[in-house]
Amino acid sequence: MPGLRMAYRIWGPADGRPLVALHGGTGSGESWAALAAALRATTRTYAPDLRGYGATGPADAYSLELVRDDVRGLLDALALTRVTVLGHSSGAVAAHLLARASPDRVAALVLVEPPPPVPLGLRLPPRPAGPLPYDWAAREAVVAELNAPPPTWWEELTEITAPTLVVAGGPASHLPQHELARMAARIPAARLVTVEAGHAVPAARPAELATVVRDFLAALPG
């Protein structure tokens, strides 16, 4: 993350299992406070404000591959050699890109309502009036990327080696749930669960999400 000063929050004990949580398109690191509190007995959660968001602030360019690289830089800066990576929405895309590009750094992967790497036809609403806690250009860039994802993103799902949990939000989500199922089936060591919450699973059902994440982590070796 050359030239980018990245803000982040930490919750949980120093000897807990390290988990890096990546927020979605209108969130921030603070979006993970409830989940981190539910997991704090065994998990140390690191939650950055991604480029263009919160205290990290605007950047010169935006893409999910840049976010992936920022997160890898954060792991280096914090001397985190191998972690669980959890992402919601666009943060989940950055998470699976990291797992594919740096398998040695990702011990496990949790994808919460990940936009499938197929053209989605998402429509960005008009920019809200007044100051925003994020750079609107970041939202525009990410939505454009999700609507026209590189074909390699779909192809490379088969190369993810980390144990993976895909959390779908059910029929109330705007994402096509059958595509999430296809996505999960394409990742070799993935399983799919549904938390009936729509797209905003972390905000709408944090306790239920914490339970499925805790159970997933508890079943991992080591």
What is the predicted function of each stretch?
Residues 66-83:
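Conserved acidic catalytic loop of the alpha/beta-hydrolase fold
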Residues 1-5:
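N-terminal cap/lid segment of alpha/beta-hydrolase-fold proteins
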Residues 190-222:
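Catalytic active-site module of serine/aspartate enzymes centered on a nucleophile-bearing elbow/loop
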Residues 112-159, 175-178:
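Helical cap/lid subdomains and adjacent loops of hydrolase enzymes that gate the active-site channel
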Residues 81-118:
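Conserved hydrolase catalytic core segment
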Residues 7-57:
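Conserved HGGG/HGGXW glycine-rich cap/lid loop of the alpha/beta-hydrolase fold
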